Amino acid sequence: YPPKPENPGEDASPEEMTKYLTALRHYINLVTRQRY
């Protein structure tokens, strides 16, 4: 599996949160595609 994106935490900037959520969505897509 690809590495799971790091959660930037409570004090992250909006840009960091957006980047994290985008990376997380991409990660989930990769993992679910491999499983099914």
UniProtKB/Swiss-Prot annotation:
Modified residues (Tyrosine amide): 36
Domain of life: Eukaryota
InterPro entries tied to this protein: Pancreatic_hormone-like, Pancreatic_hormone-like_CS
MF terms (GO), sorted A to Z: neuropeptide hormone activity; neuropeptide Y receptor binding
Keywords assigned: Amidation, Hormone, Secreted
Gene Ontology CC entries for this record: extracellular space
Entry's Gene Ontology BP terms: feeding behavior; neuropeptide signaling pathway
Family, per entry: Belongs to the NPY family.
Name recorded for this polypeptide: Peptide YY-like
